[in-house]
């Protein structure tokens, strides 16, 4: 069953995608139906559930699982809407999937997961991971993540991703069988080491700089936004106090009483309206947060490019030093001061046989080195090509998404203003009748 | 000296509340006739023919009274014949002191004034002088409050534009209230204040009231026997009202504080969009647009906050002082009644002598009733003023908030096309 399933995916991922279509996908990269995997199946994270169990060190822990539902698009369009396939996943499994994608597709700006812990919160918003609002926002975020991967021209075809959606039990083993973990470890080590590229690619350097700036500005924006939300909340809620005092005051008035009383109700309504407003604004904040994390993904790609470039440069340097050694050995001259030169002076010349053997060894090493440089060159070129394509795709997606986010933010502000005008008009009518 | 004419016309209206409301509000004539008689005992007879018809006509028509009450806003405006404004504050610096004077302009058709128009300059202490004079010469009346003299030093700059403007508004309100009062507006000190080139502040110093004497009767916690329920109710009302105003004042202050802090965040929030826009290509304009929009909203918010702290709070505080003035009048009334009750008791103790009630006690009774009538009239006038003032104040607050939201709305609505434009164009080329 599992086998035939994995057969299927390979087919799903690759068929029907003519080059022109995939080209189209590169351009039209928004999370929409009609792109790659989403053409075949509907994906949703339908609900979240709290569970309790034992963790690795046998400690009792509470965690949240999310229900992933998939159903073939064809069936849905025919109106038969069968029971969707569904399975439960934990956040940590999403993380595992993303890590796998990061290692396997180093040239892709991998869609980020929603935040692990609530950040940039204002006081009314709970930072508790078990908070229902937080869980709900994360559910939406996880669904968005799946849709983004499913609509990505490269990632959508991944076998492991398909299994993530369809195979609850066997999936984890399959991921580890890919051996990505080992690769991840060595990559991580290499990435953490400090290295300096001699000839950095200007485009990637700029893109990395852009990622830095984007991350800095969006996090600042989110910080100030959270503080402003706190203040706005205060402004509205304090108006609610008018509601009470007007009502009390109305009790000692005759002609003014009715007007005051009803104006008080409008003040109550005004104070209550901020809850919905800020809840909506939180959605905007989540959209910004996605790009805050996207900035990190973008920087990761640039960093991996640097590493690839560095590996190429190291190979080239290695080769040229081998070549230099060969030259020295062949001509017997030592251009620069070296240990070898010293030893030869101290212990006399090597025998011709020895030299011959050394030369031979160097010869093979140079051959290997040349092969290596060639490979690295190809690797680097491919990386640049793939990465740049994906970065272009990402840029377009980003411009589109953020523009949409700004529009919905503006619309939200407009509706808030309209609500404000309405409430104050109502109150004014009451006041003018006093 | 006011015991001659007025008390004779008042007793008949003494216990009937409808008439009492009617009396002060009814017409300028009755008011006009009464004030001279306080000042000029010689003319007291005039009050009789004018006062009596009102008294006899009123008991029948409580409905006509209602009509009058409803109409009185308009009536006031139509019959007003004394217009006073305070404007043009000027700073004077001398070696001795620095102070502000305000121009007081008067337009009137009243014959008590020699000229139809006056323009004089007065400083705060002149206003203060006037208020003391009014309080002394019209002890039975509610004298509107002046803005507080002492402001916390260091916290408020006494010569700042905002402070002077707030004070000017309060002084203007004070004079207008006096000018609209059917009795106070005929006070000679008021006349002098409005018209005299130089205020002779010594003038009228001798005119000390008899009311002052009755203070001694209330010392030692004398308890009134027969304080009419309505006055007790007034006191209770004022206490409650003070409390509510205090709460409203605190709420308004907190809102201003929250708004000010919100404004500070917005001032930081807008520019972040701007710095973001600096390194985006396609998003440059939209982000710049949002930044501008937030900045517009900040300005609108700043205006709202300023309006609230300069127009809303001072009026609230003035009303707290107004209530204090009213409480003072109530206290004075109690004192006058206390004097009467003490004297009456003394007489009752020697009841057996069967002598007629001494005129002294009768005079006292007259004075109590006169005071009651004046107070009730002022109370109703005050209630009416208060209703109008708060209607205006709260409607104004609603208006300011509406304006604020309308400005923000306009800013965000004008942003939408800017956000959409390029996208549509792109959609077409795709």
Swiss-Prot record, chain B:
Q: Main localisation, per the record?
A: membrane
Limits of the BAR domain = 223-428
Q: Where is the protein localized?
A: Early endosome membrane
Q: Where is this region: Disordered?
A: 1-66
Q: Which domain of life is it from?
A: Eukaryota
Per the record, its GO cellular-component terms are: early endosome; early endosome membrane; phagophore assembly site
Q: According to its record, how does it sit in the membrane?
A: Peripheral membrane protein
Q: Where is the composition biased (Low complexity)?
A: 57-66
Q: Where is the composition biased (Polar residues)?
A: 1-18
Q: Which UniProt keywords apply?
A: Endosome, Membrane, Protein transport, Transport
Q: At which positions is a 1,2-diacyl-sn-glycero-3-phospho-(1D-myo-inositol-3-phosphate) bound?
A: 123, 125, 153, 167
- InterPro entries named in the record: AH/BAR_dom_sf, PX_dom, PX_dom_sf, SNX30_BAR
SUPFAM superfamilies the record matches: BAR/IMD domain-like (SSF103657), PX domain (SSF64268)
The residue ranges of the PX domain are 80-201
Q: Which GO terms describe its molecular function?
A: phosphatidylinositol binding
**Annotated GO biological process:** endocytic recycling; mitophagy; piecemeal microautophagy of the nucleus; positive regulation of autophagosome assembly; protein transport; reticulophagy
Which function does this protein serve?
Involved in the regulation of endocytosis and in several stages of intracellular trafficking. Together with snx4, involved in autophagosome assembly.
Say which family it is in. Answer: Belongs to the sorting nexin family.
According to UniProt, the name of this protein is: Sorting nexin-30
Q: Which organism is it from?
A: Danio rerio
